[in-house]
Regions:
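Structured non-transmembrane domains adjacent to transmembrane bundles in polytopic membrane proteins
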Residues: 43, 52-74, 82-162, 390-577, ...
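Membrane-embedded transmembrane helical bundles of large multi-pass transporters/channels
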Residues: 1-41, 108, 132-392, 499, ...
Length: 717
């Protein structure tokens, strides 16, 4: 099948490239035609992503009907004296006059707000016409900051803007830097691996092209099917596509280079390359897609969108890797690798005893001491995995770029006002007879709950009362969520007048409900994803023991990754816990990508067994020949995720996935899996056949690489 596909591609490469360009142009044009700048198909409201039966969701629905929020977004101004002294009456008068001085484009209103109990700072709120992450809002925040500086110049007052719109404005520049850094890392690593500027630049261009196709397709899908993309999906999608797309290109280009070195012409070399890697890469992509697709079983809406979106994107990327990439590189031939010389590094060598490089050294170690390698690898990964015993989840999603104005202003606010000022908990009281008197009496009872630092106001409209409460703890902290579930909700329901109903909502209550749902999701998604991956492995490898072994290996890799993350962020970094999404995201990435790389190594190992090698020889040869391509792909993918460490909201996910990919690459694919295969031998592939059809006695010296080889014999460059 892949030979037929490759032959068709290299015969008409221009048509293949034109078809992809046509698809890109059509989807991009359609996306712009339906694009809604207000971001109605993008949301970060977690209440939108929970099942309807949860109390926080019901509270949000009641609030949106009875007390609809104005369109757009908001930013909060924090004003204080430069000398830290309490605000004077003259200072207060200047702040009262700010609304007239801050009427800039994109801002609908500015309203003076609360004064801190110690009188040292005061708030003001600006309403913006656009959504927080819209370009017009980012520009409006910039104008607000300039106007504020002008208005307070020489007054002895200093101010900073924070809140959702200001945080988005500060994060937008960092996002550009992160994505630019990611592309730079990939460019540099491709240059190191292939020593070809053409490959580095062209590969990045092709991957970005396919990424645009995927993004446009998902955007159009949102318009047709009504799903919404949150910031996690939008942040992860380009990272995944850049990393995985580069992976597939590396596998193709390694094999293509080997055949060009062997003397094949550019078309024959590409047909050979695609026919040999096509099956393994396709199955690997299916494993990744199935792992991501398992998120459909989650009851959290953001995961239900994230998983299928990534699955579709990965399948598009593998389609490009088998059509678009071969078409482009078959046209270039040897010129793609310029200025590197395509000389076979193994030419004239009759044995691999003198082979150098990490892969060759690892191969010799596995051939001589497979049991030692297996035990040592399991021990190291097991020790790292012990960190999972101390894992705690964190729901603190309000991380702002360190050193930014929004982060500094938030620190000022928290020093003088309750921690929950920017994210009040909202309690709704509904039913006949609900009036202001009943609502205020109800609010007084709620204010006695220990977690409540201060009431935030009472409103009554159409038989619905809204009571805002400012919590004493940070709204996304575990203490706040525990208190809302264990103290505030029971008290609110008990204090409700007869015949009325109570709904506790707000961000803290929403994340308390998410915590409950997520715990149940983890117990469902983990085993289902593992089972589906195991089934795919069994169908592809046709070996029971090897399939079970690969699953066990990637599970150990996941535990080691999560344990390392606990060590880095909780123990060394002093953070309260790991992002609540991290275990599920890391499990899927490490399991899928770890399996992906292992498939390539195991496929090569099985071919070496069929060529007549002993299990130890086959394991060593698989590492020596497949190891460099896997290492190059793993390092590039880890590098692309590692850049996310610069993002305050994605740092944990970025580092964890990068560590997990490196563990999967070197700990599993280079060491543990080949060592276990060397120990178990041909029995690992039962009931599939692995013996040479000719019945030849296994050779003690090296044999020519079989034609079915997955990746070339290279040393890491």
């Amino acid at each position: 099948m892949f030979t037929t596909l490759a032959t068709a591609v290299v015969r008409r490469p221009g048509r293949v490239i034109a078809a992809w360009l046509l698809v890109l142009a059509a989807l991009t044009a359609a996306t712009f035609a339906v694009y809604e700048p207000e971001g109605s198909r993008s949301t970060d409201s977690q209440a939108d992503f929970l099942p309807d039966r949860y109390e926080s969701v019901k509270a949000a629905e009641i609030g949106s009907r009875a007390f609809p929020d104005p369109d757009g977004s908001s930013a909060v101004l924090v004003v204080r004296r430069a000398d830290g002294a309490p605000l004077t009456s003259a200072d207060q008068a200047r702040i009262d006059g700010l609304p007239q001085q801050l009427q800039v484009a994109g801002v609908t209103s500015v309203t003076p707000g609360a004064v801190a109990p110690d009188g040292r700072l005061r708030l003001a709120e600006a309403r913006l016409a656009g959504e927080a992450d819209a370009e017009e809002s980012i520009d409006a925040v910039g104008r607000l900051r300039d106007a504020t500086d002008d208005a307070l110049a020489g007054t002895g007052l200093v101010a900073g803007w924070t809140g959702e719109a200001a945080g988005a404005a500060d994060g937008s520049l960092l996002d550009l830097i992160v994505h630019g850094g990611m592309m730079l890392v990939i460019l540099v690593l491709l240059l190191v691996v292939f020593r070809s500027p053409a490959i580095a630049l062209l590969n990045l261009l092709l991957v970005l092209m396919v990424s645009q196709v995927a993004t446009s397709l998902l955007t159009l899908g949102g318009e047709v099917f009504g799903y919404e993309l949150d910031s996690s999906t939008k942040n992860l999608l380009p990272v995944v596509l850049l990393g995985i797309g580069t992976d597939y290109a590396v596998f193709l280009l390694f094999r293509y280079r080997e055949r060009l070195r062997a003397g094949d012409d550019r078309r024959a070399a590409m047909v050979h390359a695609v026919s040999r890697i096509g099956g393994a890469v396709t199955v690997s992509a299916l494993v990744v897609a199935v792992a991501f697709g398992a998120l459909l079983l989650s009851r959290i809406g953001s995961f239900q969108v994230l998983g299928p979106a990534l699955a579709v994107a990965v399948l598009l990327m593998v389609a490009a890797a088998l059509t678009l990439f071969p078409a482009v590189y078959s046209l270039l031939g040897r010129r793609a690798y310029w200025p590197a010389k395509l000389v076979d590094p193994s030419a004239g060598r009759t044995d691999d005893a003198g082979a150098t490089g990490p892969a060759a050294r690892a191969a010799r170690l596995i051939a001589r001491r497979p049991a030692l390698v297996a035990v040592a690898t399991v021990a190291v990964l097991g020790l790292l995995g012990l960190g999972t015993l101390h894992h705690r989840s964190s729901y603190e999603i309000d991380r702002l770029p360190p050193g930014s104005e929004s982060a500094e202003a938030l620190d000022w606010l928290r020093s003088g006002l309750p921690a929950g000022t920017l994210s009040p908990t909202v309690v709704y009281l509904t039913g006949p007879g609900v009036d202001r008197v009943a609502a205020e009496r109800f609010a007084e009872r709620l204010a006695e709950v220990p977690i409540v630092a201060a009431p935030g106001g009472v409103e009554v409209e159409g038989g619905v009362a809204q009571v805002q409460l400012l919590l004493a703890e940070a709204p996304y902290s575990q203490r706040a969520m525990d208190a809302v579930k264990g103290q505030l909700r029971p008290t609110a329901h008990a204090a409700a007048p007869p015949g009325t109903r109570v709904y506790v909502g707000g961000e803290t209550a929403t994340y308390a409900d998410i915590q409950t749902v997520l715990d149940e999701d983890l117990r469902l998604v983990f085993p289902v994803a593992a089972g589906l991956i195991g089934l795919l492995l069994l169908l592809m490898l046709r070996g029971l023991l090897v399939s079970i072994g690969l699953l066990a290996a990637v599970a150990l890799g996941f535990a080691a990754t999560l344990g390392t993350s606990v060590l880095v962020f909780q123990v060394l970094g002093g953070q309260s816990g790991l992002n609540f999404q991290l275990p599920l995201v890391v499990f899927l990435f490490v399991t899928a990508i770890g399996t992906d790389y292992n498939i390539l190594v195991v496929a090569r190992l099985r071919e070496e067994l069929r060529a007549g090698r002993t299990p130890r020889q086959a394991a060593a040869e698989a590492v020596r020949r497949a190891g460099p391509a896997v290492a190059a792909a793993g390092v590039i993918l880890a590098g692309s995720f590692g850049v996310l460490v610069a993002s305050p909201t994605m740092a944990q996910v970025g580092l964890a996935v990068a560590v997990g990919v490196l563990i999967a690459t070197f700990g599993l694919s280079w060491l543990l899996v080949p060592a276990l295969a060397a120990l178990t031998g041909r029995a690992a592939f039962w009931p599939a056949r692995t013996r040479s059809r000719s019945g030849a006695v296994p050779k003690t010296g090296p044999v020519p690489a079989p034609s079915e080889a997955v990746v070339p014999a290279e040393t890491m460059v």
